[in-house]
Amino acid sequence: MKTVYAFLADGMEEVEALMVIDLLRRTKKLNVVTVSIKDELLVKSSHNIKLYADKNINEIDFSSGDCIFLPGGMPGTTNLGACEKLADEIVEYNNQGKLLAAICAAPTVFSNLGLLKDKNATSYPSFEDQMECNNYGGGVVRD
């Protein structure tokens, strides 16, 4: 069974996180693990909803994962982007050709790491100026 690591940071958009996590878990074909980027499992959303991650970033074996998923929201996206360990692993996943997925503002994390320069990508429209990619736009982009 493939493993998706869904990263949670304080200030994330809870609908973007929980909707994706819920839908992926309902397939019963994926092992979806929610991961806090801090030592504490408790994560507060942008609307102060408290969620408990399954694990923290130091408890997972990145090599056993198949996908990294980042929900958007602010300041959640900023917090995800500031997590050096996560950034290093995103680059490694990209180098290995593993799946990277993000929604809303979170694709900017990939852009800031220089991973979208030759890719088609999209984001929440107000973040377009932060997206350094080959071709911008569209509701859903896979590249």
Predicted features along the sequence, with ranges:
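N-terminal beta-loop-helix "entrance" segment that forms/cooperates
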Residues: 35-54
